[in-house]
Amino acid sequence: MRLSIVYILLATAALKASADVRLTARVAPVEIETQSASGLNHAWVTDGSDGLRAEATSPGGARWYVFGTAGASDATEIGEGAAIDLRAGSHGYIAEEGDVRTFFWVTDWRETPMSAGELSVASSDCSSLELAYTGSAPRMTYHGINGRSFEIDRQITLTHTILEASEEGGFVRREDVESYPFLRDVIVTDAPLCATRFTLRGDRFLTAWQRPAEVTTPDFTPTAVACFTRMTTEQRENSNEQTAGEDAASGSAPLEATFTAWATDAAAFTEWQIATDEEFNDITLSEQSADFTYTFRDAGNFFIRFTAANADGSCQTYGDIYNVSIGESRLSCPNAFSPGDSEGVNDEWKVSYRSIVEFECHIFNRWGVKLASLTDPSHGWDGRYKGRLVDPGAYYYVIKARGADGRRYNLGGDINIIRRKR
């Protein structure tokens, strides 16, 4: 007897509450997840058909039908009762109990087995590695009630050690597991950054049946390189220093920056580069140490990067490009302050400056006696001479300075000390 039902009715029936079925066999079938578009209630993968049997879960039994890859619209009746022996191979089935039907598909693993073989590295470059497997694990499928095929994920795993950048700095090793639904002739993965072995294991069905296939390559020595870098800049909190911007890598010279780099195992050559252009055509400094500190004393834009290469130079990598901007110099002097008048308010004479790399200031009274000398523009004069506040009146400063942009300053002027009468 042949069951001829149009697909629309089948799809509707598949959505009804079913009486359900269960499968048994000498080797336990593995139930797999199905896509809703398949219209199936269940799907199983079996290890052959030895002892393969379907049972209806309701006491009344069921009428049983079989269908093929064309779909369930042309199913053929194969028996009636509480249980039935299923056919060898991959087929779809219907368990019909009154107007309720349960649709399920059985895929025979032996039709597309995962065969044993050897695993080896076929080729590798700076970004990828190809593995050759002499065995096979082809695509597996099941079919829905309208004949459409759906891929079964065999969950074949490839395990190896990788390096990952750490937030604390440097690289850490961890085991990486990639999963494949089936195997092609060549397995392509990212080029490893550390010595490792590759282990292929699977598939999920052999694993469930406690006889997984497993093969491992010999040790692989990496040629690919990667790097991870960091830059930190000196943060000065001088109230009289003008910054060039809110960016921590922009500011007033001299600006001290510390550069730190970590490179992976295959790196044989490492270098920090400082250039005046983003394309690094004009490299003004090269430093082969992974960690170094540099003080930017000249005005302008500077670009910094780290590079690493393997022993033969076939693989090279570059870190992030950092931009340091040093603003043009500025220097101006106040002409009055009031030391001792109100503590913490206008009680120190300081220049206002930006990007001053050389500084010398001398302060005199009207008789030419030197009262104070300053060699750091962030420092100031507190209005004291030999520990005592000087009297109100006019005093004089002489300044010689040089900016990061090469500009020279020769300044002189008066300083008026103001103090309210008490």
Feature-to-residue mapping (PLM):
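Bacterial Sec-dependent N-terminal signal peptides
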Residues: 1-25
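Conserved structural position at the C-terminal beta-strand
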Residues: 95-97, 202, 308, 399-401
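Short loop/turn motifs at secondary-structure boundaries
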Residues: 248, 253-260, 266, 297-299, ...
